[in-house]
């Protein structure tokens, strides 16, 4: 998986601002790890990709 999304230059995914409170659930179990990718796609509308990299888990634009 790439550390970059669309126009977002993320050297580290930890730099990305997680928007939405639904991400509080993904830390519960590894089984939910596939769910975070689905949620990221839905959060895409509220994501801001650019030099500031305010992407949800850096998956904005995917």
Curated annotation (Swiss-Prot):
InterPro entries: MT3. This is Metallothionein-like protein 3A. Expressed in roots. It comes from the Eukaryota. Metallothioneins have a high content of cysteine residues that bind various heavy metals. Belongs to the metallothionein superfamily. Type 15 family. GO terms for molecular function: copper ion binding; zinc ion binding. GO terms for biological process: intracellular copper ion homeostasis. Keywords: Metal-binding, Metal-thiolate cluster.
């Amino acid at each position: 998986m790439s550390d970059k999304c669309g126009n977002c230059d993320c050297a580290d995914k930890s730099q990305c601002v997680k928007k939405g409170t639904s991400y509080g659930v993904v830390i519960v179990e590894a089984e939910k790890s596939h769910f975070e990718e689905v949620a990221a796609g839905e959060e895409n509308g509220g994501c801001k990709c650019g030099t500031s990299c305010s992407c949800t888990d850096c998956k904005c634009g995917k």
